[in-house]
Amino acid sequence: MNDNIKLTEQEIIRREKLKKYESLGIKTFKKFDHEKINIYSNEIVEKYNHFSKDELLEKQIKLIIAGRILTQRGPFIVIQDTNGKIQLYVDKKELEEQKETLALLDIGDIIYVKGTLMKTMKGELTIKVNFFDLLTKGLTPLAEKYHGLVDVEERYRKRYLDLISNPNIKEIFWTRTKVISKIRKFFDEQNFMEVETPMLHSILGGANARPFKTYHNSLSSSFNLRIATELPLKKLLVGGIDRVYEIGRIFRNEGIDTTHNPEFTSIEFYQAYSNLEIMMEQTENLIKFIAKELGLSKIKNHDVEIDLLADFKKINMVDAVSEATKVDFRNIDLDKAIEVAGRYKVKVEKYFKVGHIINELFELLIEKTLIQPTFVTGHPIEISPLAATSEDERFTERAELFINTKEYANMFTELNDPLDQRRRFEAQLEEKESGNEEASEIDESFLSALEYGLPPAGGCGIGIDRLVMLLTEKESIREVILFPTLKKKQV
């Protein structure tokens, strides 16, 4: 043992118990070599709770279960498995051969149990233990009273303890699993192909974001961790896969707050022979499908009720900003736009054009008003380098879905003109040279693919973490990511 490790009194006692187990010839960290478990705690309640005490006594139902000890009170022990808790009853007289090991058990130990199902005088389902075995010894005590882990930072840092101490946390991640499963079901039933595309990209593209950089020694080449899956997925449309989607991790080297984590999970889907209207329809149908499958029609944000099954609203970005500022942003020059931005204390970067200012004012004035599901359309071309233009070529066929003031989805009629796409990339490169670190680079391999012909298409990206936040009514993205990114702990 490292002499520099300071142990608490409880930790010392538990290590002394290890020696006692050793003296009894019992391994404390063993391989599983028993008859396999045949039930989980929640199944016990579902299958047998309707039986009376006398009926259970007559049936003599034999069960095998395993779990972590949460409490010990006299002859009663409560264990927790993956699906819940169950009470055990230990009659020391019937376990005479195991009395020494029984006395060495601690809260936090993981045990294997064979027993007979019964009900107590109070009617609580309980397993009367016929045999038990210690599978794993807990050397560090759980938080006091097994629900004392309340420090938020510590909960995220030690998620394994959070899951033990706060059973409701596990429900969040079951919901997350179900959401991803329902997304797959939605697209699989429409004959979309699920694919996997590279995480290492030599050229930035698919979004405006700062990347994480890495280096491949064998290739002597620098790479970026992907900031989106868009460009390789659109290459697959060129290749004749007309309906395609990817669920995967995205990495963006940006700030951390309640809605942003540097690595997150997204779903991007692309459909040939479609457009923005079809993408909005698909997105609305997807969210309603998930809500129905999970039995959720309405969710609450503090005192506001959000109806996920009502028709989603639509507003135009430029019209909304014009109405809020009382300035016609469809007919305005850059100098006037800068003047209006100044009124609202918007910082104007040197690469800004009118479209950038419209977007900044939208984020400042409009986003906070979007509570019910709302599609925002008509984004300026300056902030939409991959979207097709609308009839007014200053704006694009793009939409974002906002719910409860947050963006949940981003969708386009995809730009399939390789010549226009090159001009857009070149404009992005000029922005990068003027200080926009998030601007896209010129991806020659993507342009080459477009020159073979990208069919008219629509595409959409949805942040799964935020969607789970919405459906579980959580305020922070860290609550729905098992191991969120945290600052290094100061020792």
Swiss-Prot record:
Residues engaged in binding Mg(2+) 1: E400, E407
Subcellular location, record wording: Cytoplasm
TM spans (from-to): none
GO cellular component annotations of the record: cytosol
Disulphide bridges, residue numbers: none
Ligand binding (Mg(2+) 2): E407
EC number: 6.1.1.6
InterPro entries named in the record: Aa-tRNA-synt_II, aa-tRNA-synth_II, aa-tRNA-synth_II/BPL/LPL, Lys-tRNA-ligase_II, Lys-tRNA-ligase_II_N, Lys-tRNA-synth_II_C, NA-bd_OB-fold, NA-bd_OB_tRNA
GO molecular function, one term: lysine-tRNA ligase activity
Keywords, ordered alphabetically: Aminoacyl-tRNA synthetase, ATP-binding, Cytoplasm, Ligase, Magnesium, Metal-binding, Nucleotide-binding, Protein biosynthesis
Biological process according to GO: lysyl-tRNA aminoacylation
Cofactor note: Binds 3 Mg(2+) ions per subunit.
Reaction catalysis annotation: tRNA(Lys) + L-lysine + ATP = L-lysyl-tRNA(Lys) + AMP + diphosphate
Cofactor needs: Mg(2+)
Coiled-coil stretches noted in the UniProt entry, renumbered to this chain: none
Entry's family note: Belongs to the class-II aminoacyl-tRNA synthetase family.
Subunit: Homodimer.
Protein name (record): Lysine--tRNA ligase 1
